[in-house]
Amino acid sequence: MNQQPQMTAQDQRAARAMRQSKIMSIIAAGALALVFVVAMAMWVYLRTIDRNATVTERDQVSTDGNLAPTADESAVANVADKASKSVVSIITNIEESSSLRTTTRQSAAAGTGIIVSKDGYIVTNKHVVSKASSIRVIASDGTRYDDVRVVGEDPLNDIAYLKLEVGNTVLTPLSLGDSATVRVGQSVVAIGNALGRYQNTVTSGIISGKGRPVTASTSGNSAQRTESLTDLIQTDAAVNSGNSGGPLLNRSGQVIGINVAVATNAQGISFAIPVNAMKGTLKSVLAGKGVRRAYLGARYVMLTPDIAKQVGTSAKEGAYVMTSGEKSAIVAGSPADKAGLREKDVITKINSLVVGKQGDVSSLIGEYQPGDVVALTILRDGKERVVRVTLSEYQGGESGE
């Protein structure tokens, strides 16, 4: 019988080393395979993410123009669509005399107007049409009206009323809002004949202040002059030369102010006359009575914390009745005099409207007509009382509101 050769201890060690080497090779190969598989998986994953990111980016950056406008954009566009047909451009001419001849030129101070009746009444700023020898009105559809008359002016508010001869044409008047209810921060839209060249330019912004007094330099159709206005609405909606007389609108498309002035020493500040200040005179004009402005006959200063401290009143807001220079606080024979108002009274309400918060005495009285009876809530010697006043008609040259 053949016998297998016996392995020596050295041979056994060599065999074990060979087996271990094979095992290590297998492990190394497996590790390499695992690394390859993981790398491929990561590559596929990253490609997928990149592809999804590209799709997302393409979804967000639309080039087909189908993205819906925001609610804010839609609101401004809706107001513009609704109101633009009721806003007109005004172009004036004047006759200037020289030592040699009389020349006629077109004024550079073109303006804007608001249609306030179906039969052709327009409201604008007085300085836009003052001393004009002829006036042309251009509607938003391009229709030109050359037969235009100034039918009334309210110089205290820089307001003028025009009448167009429209024949059988029915115009679309703008709806008037309530300027006593406007709030700081409220969104507004302005429309006007910007720079006298760009008809129905639309801008938007917010009400940035209320009750602002402004001394404005206006050129209009004559030499530059200064006009002092009170209780104006301040806005950051862009209002440019040529926008004077145009509407300041709320988001419902209602007129809450008539644009009148721009702060030349600051950007983003414009002013508008509260619409309530012209409602009374508008009623009289539409009734064919011309401008009849309601009159109280009291001189006052609007209270601030500093003024209240100076005059020694406990009232926080309102109109403090006081003398103005050498002029008495109450105009003799005026409605205020007949109703028994006194110096140092504080007018806190006119009917239900709060003086100060909702306007000053001038603009709040402007909503009424001569002959109207209003209830004034006053603070006298620390006690509140109500007096009834029958307003009279303002006569040019009278002072006091």
Regions found by a protein language model. Give the residues of each.
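N-terminal Lys/Arg-rich, disordered targeting/topogenic segments
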Residues: 1-21
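Serine-dependent protease modules
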Residues: 20-310, 315-317, 322, 339, ...
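Flexible, small-residue-rich helix->loop connector segments that border functional cores
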Residues: 77-79, 344-347, 376
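Conserved PDZ fold ligand-binding element
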Residues: 122-123, 333-359
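PDZ domains, with a preference for the canonical peptide-binding region formed by the helix
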Residues: 128-130, 270, 349-377
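Acidic- and glycine-rich mobile interface elements
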Residues: 170, 319-329, 348-351
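Surface-exposed loop/turn motifs at beta-strand-loop junctions within extracellular Ig-like
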Residues: 380-382
